[in-house]
Amino acid sequence: MNNNFFNSDFDSILRRMMQDMQNSNQTSNKKYYINGKEVSPEELAQFTQQGGNHSAEQSAQAFQQAALRQQGQQSGNGNYLEQIGRNLTQEARDGLLDPVIGRDKEIQETAEVLSRRTKNNPILVGEAGVGKTAIVEGLAQAIVEGNVPAAIKDKEIISIDISSLEAGTQYRGAFEENIQKLVEGVKSSQNAVLFFDEIHQIIGSGATGSDSGSKGLSDILKPALSRGEISIIGATTQDEYRNNIMKDAALTRRFNEVLVNEPSAKDTVEILKGIREKFETHHQVKLPDDVLKACVDLSIQYIPQRLLPDKAIDVLDITAAHLSAQSPAIDKVTTEKRISELEHDKRKAVSAEEYKKADDIQKEIKSLQDKLENSNGEHTAVATVHDISDTIQRLTGIPVSQMDANDIERLKNISSRLRSKIIGQDKAVEMVSRAIRRNRAGFDDGNRPIGSFLFVGPTGVGKTELAKQLAIDLFGNKEALIRLDMSEYSDTTAVSKMIGTTAGYVGYDDNSNTLTEKVRRNPYSVILFDEIEKANPQILTLLLQVMDDGNLTDGQGNVINFKNTIIICTSNAGFGNGNDTEEKDIMHEMKKFFRPEFLNRFNGIVEFLHLDKDALQDIVNLLLDDVQVTLDKKGITMDVSQDAKDWLIEEGYDEELGARPLRRIVEQQVRDKITDYYLDHTDVKHVDIDVEDNELVVKGK
């Protein structure tokens, strides 16, 4: 690079400066700066000598490297480890680490690998949240307690942040210099074990990716790892281990894999009991045993996309923080720390003879001490199972507290609640209710969706409405209904709308609108496949796996859990003729449209019958109730005569089309006429609807 600043004139200026330095007797009082950095005369002389023979960039790099070497020699390699890492063993001695419960096997395996003569580098492999970092902390505690092989009883585990190695390395060679200092620090200490969390980041870290010869962190460490000169503990996930570490065979063989699985529910409860005291001290909240068990049980049931113990600990922490924020209890730890700070300030004020300030500080100390004495733990909040349910509800949107409070009674009455909304389809409602009661009461195998049903019947008889009411009754709102119109899934590429595209196709990284992604975000939902007979056969093939195994693999290889969903398929393929058709006759008719293995996966095939006029009497009441809900927003009450209701039924009854014509009549004859009347009488508070001359009439008050 050509830089006019570093030319012969600049060299002459530097030579003149050097002559002044030699001729002056007051050199010690002069200061010299290069690029804003103060340097000694010797460093300036070295820079001048190199700058005269090299380009500006090379001179700057040489000076930077010399400064780094000098800094490393001054600070020492041991201090460098302290600068960029945390000594977990020392933290264990100081009692700063949480206890590790139920991981003795993994800790023992890690200790055995570390005690090897060569290739003594364990790598903890497990999914996110299973406690890989906690195992390393447990190993540090085991070293302090002496419960490890003799070969590693004096080891110090240093947790290294990879980003700290890269920080400030703007010149070529600076990163390699940091790595060499790190390696030399480990060699000189003779008892240091490095811990890299997210160790897959060492692949390519520090490499320039060009032909300049700059090496990455993993390339520099390989020789030392194979000879056993340094020992490293790594932690990473299964995917990152496969996609990064295993691609480098030379690096893989230098590590020994220690598999970390998700702990059982029983072990997780014991883990929570082990860390309970620290959470109680931090939040000033009591956490009984039943609360710990509820954290585990509810997190397993309602947060299936995450793993234990991480999700259970999060639920416990969030609940305690929520109660602590609402509790008037004094934070004892913070208050005592504040009193200690004030005592120090008071002593300084007395030393400075600022007695008025010291007196004010003493009054504040007395006030805080009185608060501590008066609290005595009597206002300490106590967590309950209901608080855990509220936390799950805030995290997932599922009304867990409502479902748990009186779940048995709700299960008993589910059929009556659905019958009040779905008119004339008692047989269908009862079949659906039985399947849901069986699943929710715990008498199902648990490896399939809550229920899978095929609703068959003519249009307008309540098939879709029953799915909506199920979503409201079970999950609290209509948003829990995922509705897919199968007329949009009739082409051969429709599978990509369900599970996303596979690698190599457009949209592989964008699966936000697929069914699998929606279920992953909302695992508790009702999935409605409307008019299933229009779907492409590949869609039906996918549903076989969902209804049989309760899971589905998306285009990116992620397994999505469908075990907390209700699957409903609807079809109007020639059924619902008003007769009491036997189930075997229904199966015979449906085999004309669907394969037997598809029909055989459903919990029930439900026939919806034609609606008669008696059923429409209840339906018109429901539709008018919806109108009243709208009028309530305007502060208007409504009274509809029986003659008006009979007139609506007569005008809206169509046996073939079901209840939809009645809905249109109510829309046109009731809502529209009330709207017209309101626009002419904006102060109206009550309306009466009756029949005059075979027409509906709206009168207001």
Curated annotation (Swiss-Prot):
Residues 81-332 are annotated as: I. It comes from Staphylococcus aureus (strain MRSA252). Keywords: ATP-binding, Chaperone, Nucleotide-binding. Residues 336-371 form the UVR domain. Residues 56-74 have a biased composition (Low complexity). Residues 46-55 have a biased composition (Polar residues). The lineage of its organism: Bacteria, Bacillati, Bacillota, Bacilli, Bacillales. The keyword Ribosomal protein does not apply. Residues 46-78 are annotated as: Disordered. Pfam families: AAA, AAA_2, AAA_lid_9, ClpB_D2-small. Required for the development of induced thermotolerance. Belongs to the ClpA/ClpB family. ClpL subfamily. GO terms for molecular function: ATP binding; ATP hydrolysis activity. This is ATP-dependent Clp protease ATP-binding subunit ClpL. Residues 383-575 are annotated as: II.
